[in-house]
Design a protein with these regions (language model features):
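Residues on the lipid-exposed face of transmembrane beta-strands in outer-membrane beta-barrel proteins
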Residues: 89-93, 203, 293-299
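A short glycine-centered flexible hinge/capping loop motif at secondary-structure junctions
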Residues: 165-169, 368-375, 410
Length: 419
């Protein structure tokens, strides 16, 4: 009976393992990868919380201080003990002059704008990083595919040579050379697989998925159209990294206004009630009750010139950095457009004049070897050249794609995904 139970348990375990289905791979295009990153990336979520923090600070600014309740009581028990006493109750409130509370709210609202722009810029940078990581993975895969295609041809050649060697038509040395080249290619492909896995790992971190999730890249490495839009004022106003300097200037102006208003401290208004009982020998006991109003105005002797000078310097700093950022954006657009166009031209020339020709030469040497007009060394020399040209073509194609994407983000033409 015990043996039957053990066998049954083993069978159930086997069936459970056999019934497990591997989760389908996550299919990703460049666009879906960006959308996933904007939803899942934890660093981006941390930046977004800065907006809530700024809103919290703004909600606390521009408020009156709490009113103050006062109560006083005194008597002459420890002295003459004639029954004299006094009572005083009051409520006071401080009121700012010159709209200081409104200016505090202005500063708080500007801080919210700055936090929002920081989040938008983080989204822009993350989107660019994701697209570059996606392209990097595609490039690694294209390199591996190029080697795999030549590996298949090399393995077929090795089989042909082995069959010919058995008929004493070629030497065993040539067979070993072909097998050695196949093994070398297999090792390179294994290294490519490691590089591809590392590229996918970086992509997974950016899009915020588990390292255990399988990813299937839905696109292949291809030439990306070059944006034709030109630099304009709208480009600047669409770039959050430039807008932040504009808002920084606005923030300095708001803080200067707040400092000027703060030179006049709050006016304090108090409503009070007093009651007292005193004893005078000729008159006897007398009672008094008073309801009054008082206010106090601090004199504006305190100077905020140092703080104002600081904000004036920060305003000039923001203006200078805004101009520098504008020049940087213009230079980036010019450079990325130049590189994208140049790489597109190089790619076209490379495909027609180099890659296709090297493939034809390799094919001709292969035919010549089969017809005993060329040796194996000539074939593998042409093979090495053709492989190198294919890998160079992959590198050029990847650079064209990267610069086209960089130009798109420099022009602020990225998809306006929901943040």
């Amino acid at each position: 009976m015990k043996k039957i139970l053990i066998i049954a348990a083993i069978c159930l375990q086997f069936l459970a393992l056999a019934g497990e289905q591997k989760k389908p791979a996550l299919g990703l295009s460049r666009k879906s990868a960006v959308e996933l990153a904007l939803r899942n990336n934890q660093d981006l979520k941390a930046v977004k919380e800065g907006i809530n923090a700024a809103r919290g600070r703004a909600s606390q600014s521009g408020r009156l201080d709490n009113p103050v309740l006062g109560a006083e009581y005194g008597n002459d028990v420890l002295f003459s003990d004639e029954g004299e006493y006094s009572v005083r109750a009051s409520i006071s409130q401080k009121f700012p002059l010159f709209g200081r509370l409104a200016k505090e709210r202005d500063v708080g609202n500007i801080d919210i704008k700055l936090a929002s722009l920081e989040y938008e810029d983080a989204c822009r940078k993350l989107s660019l990083d994701v697209e570059n990581a996606y392209l990097d993975a595609l490039e690694k895969k294209a390199v591996s595919d190029a080697r795999c295609a030549l590996l298949k041809a090399t393995q077929e050649l090795a089989k042909e040579l082995k069959a010919a060697s058995e008929k004493a038509e070629v030497s065993a040395l040539e067979v070993r050379r072909a097998e050695s080249e196949s093994s070398k290619l297999q090792i390179e492909i294994m290294r490519d697989e490691v590089d591809f896995a590392a590229a996918l790992s970086r992509l997974k971190v950016l899009i915020g998925v588990s390292p255990d999730v399988d990813i299937n890249l839905a696109e292949k490495l291809a030439e990306i159209p070059i944006p034709t839009e030109k630099f304009s004022r709208q480009t600047l106003e669409s770039r959050p990294d430039w807008q932040m300097y504009s808002i920084a200037e606005e923030s300095a102006n708001a803080r200067i206004a707040l400092l000027k208003a703060g030179r006049f401290e709050d006016v304090e208004v108090e409503v009070f009630f007093e009651a007292s009982e005193s004893v005078d020998e000729p008159v006897g006991k007398s009672r008094e009750k008073i309801l009054g109003l008082s206010f106090s105005v601090p004199l504006p002797f305190k100077s905020y010139d140092g703080g104002i000078e600081e904000q004036l310097s920060l305003r000039k700093q923001a203006q200078a950095r805004s101009a520098a950022k504008e020049n940087q954006i213009m230079a980036e657009i010019s450079l990325y457009r130049l590189r994208a166009n140049k790489y597109a031209q190089i790619l076209k020339k490379h495909r027609v004049e180099v890659e296709e020709v090297s493939g034809e030469i390799y094919g001709e040497y292969l035919t010549a070897m089969r017809e005993a007009r060329a040796g194996i060394a000539d074939v593998f020399g042409a093979w090495q050249t053709h492989l190198q040209m294919k890998l160079t073509g992959v590198s050029i194609l990847a650079e064209q794609a990267r610069n086209s994407i960089a130009l798109k983000y420099a022009l602020a033409l990225e998809d306006k995904n929901e943040k």
